[in-house]
Amino acid sequence: GALGAAAAMAGDLADSVLLSFEPGSYPASTGISDPIQIQELAGGFVELGSTDVAVFGANGAKLRTIQPSYARPAIAVGNTRFALYNRAGTELRIESRTGTLYTTRTDAGILLCAMSPNGTTAVVTEHNRYAAAVQVLDPGFSVIYQWYATQSDGTPVALGFASDNRRFAAGCISAVDGQVSSRIFLMDCGADDPVALYEADAGSLILHLYWLDSQHVLAVLSDCAVLLDASTGAETARYDYGGASLVDVDTAGSGVALLLTGGGDASLILLD
């Protein structure tokens, strides 16, 4: 783990030095007419379209274009790297700003991926005996953690890593008595079992998970946003949408912005 992280950091530093000499400027034309995802990548950004992936440097220079030929492509970003995968497919690629670092095929269809700041990657796949399997790869692509979510645990639909690259939150959904049930598991790659558990109100669907700092996880659900203690899973604060619908959410440090719509109006809610 430590060796893989050190090698990754050395490679990222070498990339940064080389890329600083690439000419570029803004506004930048990406060449992608049907963007699906746009994520910040080490000061630049990566843009995913239905057929192409474009990587740009901090100065607007176009660094590379990838054509993965996936039916349902998705990306997950971690500072200078990103995971490129085919949802419901089995191919996973770890990409840097300058090239492909790692390619593998999973035993079952990929449901979701997430990446920590140092390139640690969590991969959620289908499983024939469990709701899903979660496997965590370190920056050197060795498996360091596995978790099998039972049917009562639910299927992971949201993941979020802490800045220590070791802890993560997994938001899982299942059906209970005809309603959606959301459970949030607080995990540590050094522990065999989940560290803590939070169960949302019946009918509340987990959408996003963010670590605001080392001890607080923001869980964004379909009807509210809750702040959780990362050690105990206890709810420490809550904001209910009051019947409005969530359009978007953003975090900056410990601040949170929620964009809500309802009754023909839009509201921007700032939380601290």
State where each predicted segment sits:
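Short loop/turn segments that connect beta-strands within beta-propeller blades
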Residues: 57-59, 96-99, 137-142, 189-192, ...
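Conserved blade-register residue in beta-propeller folds
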Residues: 55, 84, 93-94, 135-136, ...
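Non-cytosolic head/periplasmic domains of membrane-anchored proteins
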Residues: 62-171, 178
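Sequence/structural signature of beta-propeller modules
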Residues: 1-33
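Repeated scaffold domains used in trafficking and secretory/extracellular systems
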Residues: 31-38, 69-80, 108-117, 153-160, ...
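A short beta-strand motif characteristic of beta-propeller blades
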Residues: 17-30, 60-67, 99-105, 143-149, ...
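Short beta-strand elements that form the blades of beta-propeller/WD-repeat-like
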Residues: 36-48, 54, 75-87, 92-93, ...
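Extracytoplasmic/luminal low-complexity segments enriched in Pro/Gly and acidic/polar residues
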Residues: 172-272
